[in-house]
């Protein structure tokens, strides 16, 4: 996308995320995005709390954030920065396409602040692939590569 079609945004708060992502409670898995560099890289922030519904069953005696939700949070971060860079009036929809090389290194538990580092490694037409690393307190807890397709709102109907 050319600079003429992009906006410049360095951080996104929850209101910005709600404006571009279709996800809502309990499936909006990022609270904020910082260090945004166009649609190339950024860091999502997820504050993990015991109040999240998945902890009632995963696992009641030792709550651990499911790995699939960590990957989803990575994908939401990548999708959000792609959509946030589009000019106002050009809404889009992100479709999660693939997950590759997912690895889970350490459990994520309530009270953790999950940092989701995403970096675009490939783009072809409207499909982007991102390298993602999740960290807690500077320690890598998970990693994956995710790909998504961005379409305009008109194309998705």
Curated annotation (Swiss-Prot):
Q: What does UniProt list as catalytic?
A: 58
What cellular-component terms does GO give this entry? cytoplasm; membrane
Q: Give the enzyme's EC designation.
A: 4.2.1.59
Database matches in HAMAP family: FabZ (MF_00406)
Function, please?
Involved in unsaturated fatty acids biosynthesis. Catalyzes the dehydration of short chain beta-hydroxyacyl-ACPs and long chain saturated and unsaturated beta-hydroxyacyl-ACPs.
InterPro entries listed in its UniProt record? FabA_FabZ, FabZ, HotDog_dom_sf
A biological process (GO) of this protein is:
fatty acid biosynthetic process
Looking at the record's lineage, which domain of life comes first?
Answer: Bacteria
Protein name per the record = 3-hydroxyacyl-[acyl-carrier-protein] dehydratase FabZ
Reactions that this protein is recorded to catalyse: a (3R)-hydroxyacyl-[ACP] = a (2E)-enoyl-[ACP] + H2O
Return the NCBIfam families for the record: fabZ, PRK00006.1
Using the UniProt record, name the top-level EC class of this enzyme in a single word. Answer: lyase
Q: Record's family?
A: Belongs to the thioester dehydratase family. FabZ subfamily.
UniProt source species: Brucella anthropi (strain ATCC 49188 / DSM 6882 / CCUG 24695 / JCM 21032 / LMG 3331 / NBRC 15819 / NCTC 12168 / Alc 37) (Ochrobactrum anthropi)
Q: Where in the cell is it found?
A: Cytoplasm
Which molecular function GO terms apply here? (3R)-hydroxyacyl-[acyl-carrier-protein] dehydratase activity
**What SUPFAM superfamilies does this protein map onto?**
Thioesterase/thiol ester dehydrase-isomerase
**Cytoplasm found in the keyword field:** yes
